[in-house]
């Protein structure tokens, strides 16, 4: 155990900086439904786009390798109406080699830093899919993964808190 700690420190006693390498990234699952074309909705309809983001991370079998996934659900509906234009579901995964991250910081690292690294590629895929589906390219805004992580932690803590009876 002490040998592992010594290996993690440099000669000057400082802890080594966290290191991350992207080993690969891929689309695990994708679905695009062009409901407008199926139902013949007017093409000049003003869209109201709703985006839902979920994150997931898990350890892989190889040492120091982790999987971080961004699960995106995009629904575009007609503004001032309830007709759906399109639905896009995308599960995008990055495989990472992570070193020098303390165990207590690993979970936030995998759900904040890793998604931040692969998000630009996911954004391009979403833009291409919507364009190829007959719509203007959907350019997603940047996602604040730190806020998303904090909000999820707060939601889980509030749902696990014991309820007081009067």
Curated annotation (Swiss-Prot):
GO terms for biological process: protein folding; protein tetramerization; protein transport. GO terms for molecular function: unfolded protein binding. Keywords: Chaperone, Cytoplasm, Protein transport, Translocation, Transport. InterPro entries: SecB, SecB-like_sf. Gene3D superfamilies: SecB-like (3.10.420.10). It comes from the Bacteria. GO terms for cellular component: cytoplasm. It is found in: Cytoplasm. Homotetramer, a dimer of dimers. One homotetramer interacts with 1 SecA dimer. Belongs to the SecB family. One of the proteins required for the normal export of preproteins out of the cell cytoplasm. It is a molecular chaperone that binds to a subset of precursor proteins, maintaining them in a translocation-competent state. It also specifically binds to its receptor SecA. NCBIfam families: PRK05751.1-3, secB. This is Protein-export protein SecB. It comes from Roseobacter denitrificans (strain ATCC 33942 / OCh 114) (Erythrobacter sp. (strain OCh 114)). The gene is secB.
């Amino acid at each position: 155990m002490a040998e592992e700690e010594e290996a993690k420190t440099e000669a000057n006693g400082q802890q080594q900086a966290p290191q991350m390498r992207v080993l690969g990234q891929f689309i695990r699952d994708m679905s695009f439904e062009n409901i407008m074309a199926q139902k013949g909705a007017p093409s000049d309809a003003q869209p109201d786009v709703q985006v839902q983001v979920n994150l997931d991370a898990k350890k892989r079998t190889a040492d120091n390798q982790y999987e971080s996934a961004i699960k995106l659900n995009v629904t575009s509906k007609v503004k001032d109406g309830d007709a759906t234009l399109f639905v896009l579901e995308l599960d995008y995964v990055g495989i990472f080699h992570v070193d020098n991250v303390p165990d207590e910081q690993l979970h936030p690292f995998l759900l904040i830093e890793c998604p931040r690294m692969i998000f630009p590629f996911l954004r391009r895929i979403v833009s291409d899919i919507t364009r190829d589906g007959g719509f203007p390219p959907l350019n997603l805004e940047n996602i604040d993964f730190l806020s998303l992580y904090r909000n999820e932690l707060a939601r889980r803590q509030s749902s696990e808190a014991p309820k007081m009876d009067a």
